Amino acid sequence: MMRILLFLATNMAVLVVFNIILSLTGIQAQDATGLLLMAALFGFSGSLISLFLSKTMALRAVGAEVIKQPRNDMERWLVNTVRSQAERANLPMPDVAIYHSEDVNAFATGPSKNNSLVAVSTGLLRAMTQDEAEAVLAHEVAHIKNGDMVTMTLLQGVLNTFVIFVSRMIAKVVSSNRDGESSTGIYFLVSMVLEILFGFLASMIAMWFSRYREFRADAGSAKLVGKHKMIAALQRLQRLHEPQELEGQLAAFAINGKRGGLAALFMSHPPLEKRIAALQQLDSFK
């Protein structure tokens, strides 16, 4: 996985544009209400754009092909399995796609429950048993059922708004002299530094929520197909070679996850052993 998530990169670009516009226009956003509205506008823009373009971006990022008409038994099984799970979850049928990769992975994306995508790699289909692959598909369907794509978009928008608003307010105080006049250069420098620092904190919050969301998707898979199948799928991932990582927002909705140490704070997924332990503690969904 790229260190900078694609989903967050779009928002970072919006922050840069926001700074450039304010600098060129000389707007200091002295009115806190005006600044808050401006921060919300720019804070949510990148997230919403990423959400609405998520399916197109995902298909292009991994070269996935949507199965419009199954051409073989594997494709028929994939489509029928996702259809069955979607019906049990009271969801409209998502698009189903396959992408060619040795990576053992799958992901879900899309702007809404009515316009979603489940994609799976050829590497996963070769490496996992049918029961294990079924559990992985159920995990992705659970992401859609839980509305995780929209929830992450809203959270990211709020975090972006916070980063812009607070950094600008602090920068104004720091750059103002005793006469109440602000130094544009100091204001711009301080606001940029603070946005970077607060941006890291915001990313930590977003990734914490992403990890929490993975536990919910695992439980959703257990509800659809039984927890023993989901546990088997996660155990399979443990036994396989460390998988290649997906780019950007795809990683946040994929099945696997890695990293340790300080980088664990920026992990989109909990460690596999913790996910397995959480499933084993479920009393239902045998």
Swiss-Prot record:
Its EC number is 3.4.24.-. GO terms for biological process: proteolysis. Zn(2+) binds at residues 139, 143, 214. It is a multi-pass membrane protein. GO terms for cellular component: plasma membrane. One of its GO terms (molecular function) is zinc ion binding. The chain crosses the membrane at residues 4-24, 33-53, 147-167, 186-206. Pfam families: Peptidase_M48. Its cofactor is Zn(2+). CDD domains: M48B_HtpX_like. It is found in: Cell inner membrane. InterPro entries: HtpX_protease (IPR050083), Pept_M48_protease_HtpX (IPR022919), Peptidase_M48 (IPR001915). The active site is at residue 140. Gene3D superfamilies: Metalloproteases ('zincins'), catalytic domain (3.30.2010.10). It is an enzyme of class 3 (hydrolase). Keywords: Cell inner membrane, Cell membrane, Hydrolase, Membrane, Metal-binding, Metalloprotease, Protease, Transmembrane, Transmembrane helix, Zinc. Binds 1 zinc ion per subunit. Belongs to the peptidase M48B family. HAMAP family: Pept_M48_protease_HtpX. This is Protease HtpX. The gene is htpX.
